[in-house]
Amino acid sequence: QHNRAVYLKDGWIRDPYIYLCEDGFYYLTGTTPTYGDTREAGDPYNLGLDHVSRKMGLKPSIVGYQIRVWRSPDLAEWEYLGEPFSLEKGYWAQQFPDAFQNKSKKNWLLWAPEMYRVDGKWVFVHTSPEPVGNGANLIIADHADKNDSFAFPMGDDMRDKHDPSLFRDDDGTWYLTWSNTEIAPLKPDFQGLAAKPVHIDPSDRSIGHEGATIRKIGKKYVLFGTAWSTDDSRKGSYNLYYCTADRITGPYSERRFAGRFLGHGTPFQDKKGQWWCTAFFNGNIAPVSKLGIQNRDLSETAQTINEQGTTIVPLEVKTGKDGDVYIRAIDPAYAVPGPDEAQRFQP
């Protein structure tokens, strides 16, 4: 039912991304371990962030170097498809083979992949800090499970594109967003940037520090972004915020609250048109209880109610008489900012 969070599936994942394809399947990908890595069984709450783990004396990150994909006809039963892409097959491996040869695979990292079906092909984007720094890829391939050949039409234009995300406007123009938040239209067939990037943000403050993406709801462009509730890295809850605009390049409204514990989630619609957002475990300690969470200050360290795995949270999305869009998590555990929230929102 569209009133409470739903735990979809287990398995270590960050930044879960769900895409409803024209073939009737929901596709799931995200930041994951490499296929066959058994470490997650003994370390289910691995942080996935080496620089944080080292400071805390925890085990190294189990993040891998592949895009991995699952699909489902109903969001309930999930089939594992495979690994349609791996970093050693990417554009930067072609440009800097020594970087790949000189760094152990355990230090190769593929973060936050997204996938789209375009003109009979699959288009993937992701970010990667290692073995080539800021080495994001835009990949065109034939299949969502296994591929032998790839196209990289953006080439060098994908360098320094942290957390890339794609958006297709009503006129068919594709836009790339990245790095909270730069945006630029793309040339036909993703052949590069069609114009210089424009910086977009809410009118009152930054949207956040990562995980930016755009949706169009009614006549409004909605920019989503992720930040810690306290405005202090890995302190408090990892939240989702948004702002709206009449033009894709802005100006945008003030930053608004979409949901607690929904940071770097994917807003998507199901087959009934209902809105949901993905959610995942992102904390320095094991998940905390939902009991009384609305009134609990979490500012001591990074904390979440999300179990390891993929959760989806129902969203209320409505358009006012003025055409503006209101978005808020429906489940009470996600619906209100906590006492640790740095921003004060209008009622």
Language-model regions, residue ranges each:
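Carbohydrate-active catalytic/glycan-binding domains of CAZyme proteins
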Residues: Q1-P347
